[in-house]
Amino acid sequence: MKTSVVILAMSYITSIFANNSYDFCDGEFAISEKDDKCGFSFNPCTLYKQIQKEYSNCVILRFYLKAISNMLESICDNNKRCLPFSIDSLYRPLYNREQFKHKHHHTLYALFRNCLYLVNPIYFKEYQDALACNQLDVCYFLIRRTVCPKYGVTKYIECLKKRCEDRFDEKELAIFICDSETFVNIKLEIDACRKICPADCTLDICKIYSLDFWERRDLLKAIFDYHYCHVLSSDNTRDEIIKKIEEIYLNGTERDIKFTSFIIYQLFTDLVACKSSDKNIKRILDLICLYEKKDKCPSGVMVMIEFFVKVCSYQC
């Protein structure tokens, strides 16, 4: 019975990857017939939209992903020679979105990873155990695109801060906690995704500038939520600031974007990792004054300036 359930779940997922139609019938899966000899044609956007329609029914989502996890665990524990491909292919790293379509896309590992792309990080520990791999190369955006995307960045920043204060060994920080039930090695993944936070506890302005919209949003939320919750009067205030920053990055000039990136950089380096000082505060305020003289600040930049001054005043 268990085997038939697994096969049913796998068939269902296969149908999604082959862009087949599907229906839900009292908790069972109805698969339409279609020749998929060409393999899976995985489209992250299409898959996400299809799953999103039924995402409110988390029981179904967990059911077939858990079935895959059980099957992988069984594969690792039992006869590996029954596999139609090498067990080593289960551990092939995928470092970015483009590699979801690499030449090994037909393997069970790729199918497993493509589904993991949509899963809440709370399940990572189960999958990591099922694969029996302590260095599972899970892409950082697998964490970033989940229901609670800020956990990975928040905890990573927290660990960097502790390391700066307590001089923890690098190996001791190999595994970071994303939430109460998740253990994922995200340092390598964050480093691989344009190095949001390098190990020296600083943020690089150019790297912030190069982040995509969602990476920047998550980084800001992590910094605000973890380090500046005592300054912000409410979540609405934080959300308003983030909204203004988003407007700058979407509609502002290149100068506006670089300037805002610089403020974000200062928020982290001077006031968190390096601790604020009068010299640092004066330096950033002088640059703000220089910026105001040369160009009229857009409203979003002014909001950031006001927030920064408020934080500086609090720190002093």
UniProtKB/Swiss-Prot annotation:
Sugar-bearing residue positions: N19, N251
Signal sequence, renumbered to the chain: 1-18
Alphabetically ordered keywords of this record: Glycoprotein, Signal, Sporulation
A GO BP annotation: sporulation resulting in formation of a cellular spore
Highest taxon above the source species: Eukaryota
Intracellular or extracellular location(s): Spore, Perispore
Name of this chain's protein: Spore wall protein 30
Species: Nosema bombycis (strain CQ1 / CVCC 102059) (Microsporidian parasite)
